[in-house]
Design a protein with these regions (language model features):
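Short linear motifs in low-complexity or flexible loops
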Residues: 4-5, 10, 14, 23
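Basic polycationic patches enriched in arginine
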Residues: 17-18
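Fe-S ferredoxin-like electron-transfer domains
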Residues: 26-171
Length: 171
């Protein structure tokens, strides 16, 4: 996953560096040593994955992204079969983002690829992160929607199937 310099992506890339933190928030410098398979980095990734799965629905068999989902791949690599979290999962309704795009809030991991794509291509805010913390979701900017002819590209950018195509949903 690559993005513009200085842009952080989803927190599923924890590595051990001289200064601990998410790998995507720092640039690799000459002579820098990065340990991606150290015990500390693996433990950090396990923790991040557990948090990402707390409210993520277990609907992989019917998800349009099934078999091509980064989160599904990480979960299988991890060998995770259950969760320590016993509370009911939060349920949020599906939102219509306009055009052919639906937003399945429960699947979103807030990687912000869609937000950054729309900012870069449209040159003004169309999508944004609404709320904070565990209530954060992707939302539409005021008086904006995804009606531009190329806006449906955000569906392909979404790594977990949170953005789906109305005409091709569940097909």
């Amino acid at each position: 996953m690559q993005g513009p310099p200085g842009v952080g992506l989803a927190d599923d890339h924890a590595v051990l560096r001289r200064v601990d933190g998410p790998a995507q928030c720092g640039l690799v410098g000459e002579g820098q040593v990065v340990h991606v398979h150290s015990a500390k980095a693996l433990e950090a990734r396990k923790g991040v994955l557990e948090f990402l799965l707390i409210n993520h629905p277990l609907d992989c068999p019917i998800c349009d992204q099934a078999g091509e989902c980064g989160l599904q791949d990480y979960t299988f690599q991890e060998g995770r079969v259950d969760s320590r979290y016993r509370e009911p999962k939060r349920f949020n309704p599906v939102e219509d983002f306009g055009g052919d795009v639906l937003y399945v809030t429960n699947r979103c991991i807030l990687c912000t690829r869609c937000v950054r794509f729309m900012d870069d291509v449209h040159q003004e805010p169309v999508l944004c992160v609404s709320e904070r913390g565990d209530r954060a979701t992707i939302g539409k900017a005021a008086d904006a929607d995804l009606t531009q002819p190329w806006a449906a590209n955000v569906i392909d950018l979404c790594p977990v199937g949170a953005l789906t195509s109305k005409p091709f949903r569940y097909s």
